[in-house]
Curated annotation (Swiss-Prot):
E.C. number: 2.4.1.198
GO terms under cellular component: glycosylphosphatidylinositol-N-acetylglucosaminyltransferase (GPI-GnT) complex
Functional description taken from the UniProt entry: Catalytic subunit in the complex catalyzing the transfer of N-acetylglucosamine from UDP-N-acetylglucosamine to phosphatidylinositol, the first step of GPI biosynthesis.
Signal peptide start-end: none
Topology versus the membrane: Single-pass membrane protein
Name under which the protein is recorded: Phosphatidylinositol N-acetylglucosaminyltransferase GPI3 subunit
Regulation: Inhibited by Ras, probably via the interaction between RAS2 and ERI1.
């Protein structure tokens, strides 16, 4: 029999992004392996209630108040009744939460631990220690992950960051990278490429991403004019939206780059490949990055990558596919971009093999199989005493400083009082079980993983 798994996160379709696509593709491959998966997220405008996606993937859109960038208002306890009801209806065995900034992820782990379920958390981001937001998120994560069964990070740098932020044992933290659907990011047809080069003897640099400060938008608005002034045959395509969008508009107008810089705004994910295939170079100026899925997608389209070396980026692609900036600065990024332009112009590097290499390196089925190994491990080796409420409350008291530990302890006690109240008001044996979508039998790979 396969596992019954619940993915919890504030971020999911119709919003598009790296976390959202990670959850979707991982869930689809887990279903292909014979497991049952539901996703619990908040409502998005008219998407309220239960929706079914491809392959029988069920999504619960729970109506909750959203405060900032699709994150729900944190209340600690108010989500417990509905999440408990869903977990019992779906006979969930493993709760897998995603994202340090997701309220649903944090509260879902807390409620699942209280109910005695196995819990897994995947972190997709890097956080610092020198601003109020990072400190708050780190403290919250320390509380939430006190009784976690396993943590997954998308890069080794992300793992190191997680250990420092939460003081968790490295033994319970695994590294499983993101992946890409290489079939969705095939390079342009060689004949089309030849025709394009004959009709427009230009080098096109593509930038795709959310236009936020942490994604290097301030750097890009200074880099693009410098590169354009140095190379008459270079054009830019910028796709994305965010608070820095107006800065790009002002940059284009002030430097009179209307004919050389296309500002596309937000682009649907199904159109990202079409945008990438118009370019020769992909420029990534991010200030912080745990993995960088867009780099893999761009390389899969045979683009040469110019990027910073922050976070987990150096782990993503081999050196022959990338040109790194020595420092995260305008001058170094301009220098790296100039180097990439000269490589493309002189045809010193054949990028036509990038797609095949990427398709061999990254595959969602491999990610799913490695994740199932973690599910199997925590289900077979963990003791029932690990979810004893006295032990978990004691663990909360041992965490952090004198004030924090008492706050954690208070939250833990109130959580268990609410748990017993819900068990009395809404007994689990009176909750109707949801019928399961007809699924495949568990694959041989999963059986072998369990046996080993």
């Amino acid at each position: 029999m396969g596992f019954n798994i619940a993915m919890l996160c504030d971020f999911f379709y119709p919003q598009l992004g790296g976390v959202e696509f990670h959850i979707y593709h991982l869930s689809q491959k887990l279903i292909d392996l014979g497991h049952s998966v539901v996703i619990i997220t908040h409502a998005y405008k008219d998407r309220v209630g239960v929706r079914h996606l491809t392959n029988g993937l069920k999504v619960y859109h729970v109506p909750f108040f959203v405060i900032f960038r699709e994150t729900t208002f944190p209340t600690v306890f108010s989500t417990f009744p509905i999440i408990r009801n869903i977990l019992l209806r779906e006979q969930i065995q493993i709760v897998h939460s995603h994202g340090s900034a997701s309220t649903f992820a944090h509260e879902g782990i807390l409620h699942a631990n209280t109910m005695g379920l196995r819990t897994v958390f995947t972190d997709h981001s890097l956080y610092g220690f020198n601003n109020l937001t990072s400190i708050w998120v780190n403290k919250l994560l320390t509380f939430t992950l006190t009784n976690i069964d396993r943590v997954i990070c998308v890069s080794n740098t992300c793992k190191e960051n997680m250990i420092v932020r939460t003081e968790l044992s490295p033994d319970i933290i695994s590294v499983i990278p993101n992946a890409v659907v290489s079939e969705d990011f095939k390079p342009r047809d060689p004949t089309d490429s030849t025709k394009r080069k004959q009709s427009r003897d230009k080098i096109v640099i593509v930038v795709i991403g959310r236009l936020f400060p942490n994604k290097g938008s301030d750097l890009l608005t200074r880099i693009i004019p410098k590169v354009c002034s140095s190379h008459e045959d270079v054009e830019f395509i910028v796709a994305g939206d965010g608070p820095k969008f107006i800065d790009f508009q002002q940059m284009i107008e002030s430097h009179r780059l209307q004919k050389r810089v296309q500002l596309l705004g937000s682009v649907p994910h199904e159109k990202v490949r079409d945008v990438l295939c118009q370019g020769d170079i992909y420029l990534h100026a991010s200030l912080t990055e745990a993995f960088g899925t867009i780099l893999v997608e761009a390389a899969s389209c045979n683009l040469l990558i110019v990027t910073t070396q922050v976070g987990g980026i150096p782990e993503v692609l081999p050196n022959e596919m990338t040109v790194y900036a020595e420092q995260t600065s305008v001058s170094d990024l301009v220098q790296a971009t100039n180097k990439a332009i000269n490589i493309i112009r002189s045809k010193a590097l054949d990028t036509s093999s990038f797609h095949d290499s990427v398709s061999k390196m990254y595959d969602w089925m491999d990610v799913a199989k490695r994740t199932v190994e973690i599910y199997t491990n925590i289900s077979s080796t963990s003791s029932a005493d690990d979810k004893d409420w006295m032990k978990m409350v004691a663990n909360l008291y041992k965490r952090d400083g004198i004030w924090a530990k008492h706050l954690y302890l208070l939250c833990g006690i109130v959580e268990y009082m609410l748990f017993f109240l819900l068990e009395w008001l809404y007994p689990r044996d009176e909750i109707d079980l949801a019928p399961k979508w007809p699924k495949k039998s568990v694959s041989n790979e999963t059986k072998e993983a369990r046996e080993t």
